[in-house]
Amino acid sequence: MAPPRKLHIKSYGCQMNVYDAQRMVDVLAPEGFVETATVDDADLVILNTCHIREKASEKVYSELGRLRLARDEAASSGRRMQIAVAGCVAQAEGEEIVRRAPVVDVVVGPQSYHHLPQLLARADQAGRALETEFPVEDKFGFLPQPRPETIRARGISAFVTVQEGCDKFCTFCVVPYTRGAEVSRPVSAIIDDVKRLADNGVREITLIGQNVNAYHGEGPDSRAWTLGRLLRRLAAVPGIVRLRYSTSHPNDVDDELIEAHRDLDALMPFVHLPVQSGSDPILAAMNRKHTAADYRRVIDRFRAVRPQIAFSSDFIVGFPGETEADFAATLALVTQIGYAGAYSFKYSPRPGTPAADMQEMVPAAVMDERLERLQQLIDSQQSAFNKAAIGQTVDVLFERAGRKPGQIVGRTAYLQPAHVFPGPMFLGPGMAPDSLVGQILPVRVDSLERYSLLGELAAKPPQHARPLAATGA
């Protein structure tokens, strides 16, 4: 039997890329590849790229320069290293990648990575292989299922892609061009995926998509299902105790999604709902198709049915034409909503998008100053949200052993990391702290450490608790 080949994947960007990287591992496992944590001993290196932020492609070319040196070093010891560029930069740049970086063997877009084995074989024969067209077939129908031991090794939380692409065409965004039009997976395929994950120890599922609440997959009744209806079905899967979804668009929040948050205990009271700006003129220039008031009404609808719900968001400062009054409207919106956290970025033009051709660019110094002011406000809100947990008892889903001996780490319903030292009084004879992995237990929060909650167990775990790896659950 041939020895296994080593695979190293460096993934950039969004949750979708994390999921895609895992599926690339699944695609290549039948070809004899196993993951390695470093480039040094890799036979194949894949850069799974993101094209959302400024200079994304230049970062890839810089990394390829470093990989050229690693490849030369491997060759000097008689070992061949193949290099592939996948993801959205691959989709956007295509042949330009191999022109600028001849070290690359394979270029593959995000809708075609199920063809990686064939592309690697083609590169062996022809020197390189490119595939950046949107394929006719649905890649999900060709992706192999991960092995049970692989699922267990990935932990108790898992991403499941339910939708890809976007039809919104925000003027700053490349996603419609790199990921294509909105496509939703069938309900039956998603249910099968979630059941398989639950059978192998997964307790928390995050449904992901570029515009996840635009989900409209075909259900077993041959009708299109909404995300809310899908969540209701998945909440009934045995073993799944927490459900999340990301990323959402305000315009696609419908009654069924609101009602799902009202009715489903498993659906976490934490929603990432990007707004980008609080200024109506800027929202119009971004082609967001909603106003700041529309966004506030959506927030109010969630809070009306689930008062404890919290939100995070995305913001862009310095969009072309943004005035101080526009920026003040963003600060006002953030103040009014009150976020548990948010991501803020300076505008950067993405080639091929309408905003890249807009005039009235905001000076870099002004963008820097606005970003700092916005981030200070967001940080203060996040700090206040976390401090409010001190003295409270919160439910924590434990995920893994901590870095410190005797420590266990999990997350709250709001994705706050929680660090606990259970101690012998909370553990049975012979039980290690990681025997709590996969359980939801009450934690009394005593203090904070940066963004993490520190506390103690407020109740003893069940006597039958055992590590998931031991049960094979």
UniProtKB/Swiss-Prot annotation:
Top-level taxonomic group: Bacteria
Database matches in InterPro entries: Elp3/MiaA/NifB-like_rSAM (IPR006638), Methylthiotransferase (IPR005839), Methylthiotransferase_CS (IPR020612), Methylthiotransferase_N (IPR013848), Methylthiotransferase_N_sf (IPR038135), MiaB_methiolase (IPR006463), rSAM (IPR007197), rSAM_horseshoe (IPR023404)
Domain MTTase N-terminal, first and last residues per copy: 5-125
Cofactor: how bound: Binds 2 [4Fe-4S] clusters. One cluster is coordinated with 3 cysteines and an exchangeable S-adenosyl-L-methionine.
Entry binding sites for [4Fe-4S] cluster 2: C166, C170, C173
Matches recorded under PROSITE patterns: MTTASE_N, MTTASE_RADICAL, RADICAL_SAM, TRAM
Cofactor list: [4Fe-4S] cluster
Domain TRAM: 387-459
Enzyme Commission identifier(s): 2.8.4.3
Membership in a protein family: Belongs to the methylthiotransferase family. MiaB subfamily.
UniProt protein name: tRNA-2-methylthio-N(6)-dimethylallyladenosine synthase
Native species: Rhodopseudomonas palustris (strain BisB5)
